[in-house]
């Protein structure tokens, strides 16, 4: 009887390091493993406990389909990836992709290296304006194209707005006018929510045993987002930061003057 695989939790940024230490990639499981016991150099990536497929309090009916879902500027860097350790993010990402059958939950597409299409985990939030609490309610698996639509402000910054708009129309069946109305309404909601300072509720993660770290203070989040985007454009990642799905990092005045898209 074959021995059970010694699985590893290897963050994407550390894959080359793990490979050099002897880790091997299982393409079927889409996961790294130790080819034999006793490989001390791989212990740092020893797999933790699996994350439950349904997180505590998660509502998998929330936010179905594809739509523009802009995170208020006062909430930048409250995304899950910025609030958990890279290894925990790998565990969460693997669970989200696995329960979705390695398919985008908005359009049904799978990963395609040739098309530069990957699967990504995205947060669905609820906003209690009376209490000013932003609560994580769901993690959803999206392909690169659908994720770009979701973070339409970042698509504008990166010069991909027309591409994102076309994908939104293709997946949802919206007309050009309908897509423009949808995008404009999303930015109107974004502007209203960005006027408030939100308290973050990540109980869905902490109740599952995931350790979270506090995001930057609300007053510092826009500057931190710009720093991360500048680093990304320069081909590097700011220490401890992943560029958020930031809305209007450099074009806030432009977005307030005209209809997006």
Set out the residue ranges of the language-model regions.
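Short, conserved charged micro-motifs
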Residues: 15-17, 39-44, 133-134
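Short amphipathic alpha-helix segments
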Residues: 6-21
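A boundary/linker detector
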Residues: 28-91, 109-115, 159-261
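Short cationic amphipathic helices and targeting signals
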Residues: 3-10, 30-34
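Short, flexible N-terminal segments of the mature chain
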Residues: 17-32
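Sequence/structural segment immediately N-terminal to covalent heme-attachment motifs in c-type
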Residues: 95-100
């Amino acid at each position: 009887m074959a021995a059970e695989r010694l699985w590893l939790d290897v963050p994407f940024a550390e894959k080359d390091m793990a490979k050099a230490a002897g880790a091997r990639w299982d393409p079927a499981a889409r996961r790294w493993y130790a080819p034999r016991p006793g490989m001390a150099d791989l212990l740092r990536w020893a797999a933790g406990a699996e994350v439950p497929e349904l997180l505590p309090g998660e509502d998998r009916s929330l936010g179905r389909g594809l739509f523009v879902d802009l995170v208020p500027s006062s909430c930048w860097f409250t995304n899950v990836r910025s609030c958990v350790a890279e290894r925990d993010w790998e565990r969460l990402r693997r669970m989200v992709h696995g329960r979705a059958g390695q398919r985008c939950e908005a359009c049904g597409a799978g990963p395609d290296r040739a098309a530069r299409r990957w699967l990504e985990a995205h947060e669905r939030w609820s906003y209690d304006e009376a209490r000013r609490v932003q609560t994580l309610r769901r993690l959803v698996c999206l392909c690169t194209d659908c994720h770009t639509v979701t973070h339409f402000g970042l698509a504008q910054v990166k010069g991909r707005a027309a591409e994102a708009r076309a994908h939104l129309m293709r997946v949802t069946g919206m007309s050009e006018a309908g897509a423009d109305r949808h995008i404009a309404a999303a930015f109107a909601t974004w502007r209203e929510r960005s006027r408030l300072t939100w308290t973050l509720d990540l109980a869905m993660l902490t109740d599952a045993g995931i350790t979270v770290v506090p995001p930057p203070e609300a007053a510092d989040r826009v500057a931190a987002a710009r720093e991360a985007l500048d680093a990304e454009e320069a081909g590097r990642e700011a220490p401890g930061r992943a560029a958020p799905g930031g809305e209007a990092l450099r074009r806030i005045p432009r977005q307030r003057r005209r209809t997006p898209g």
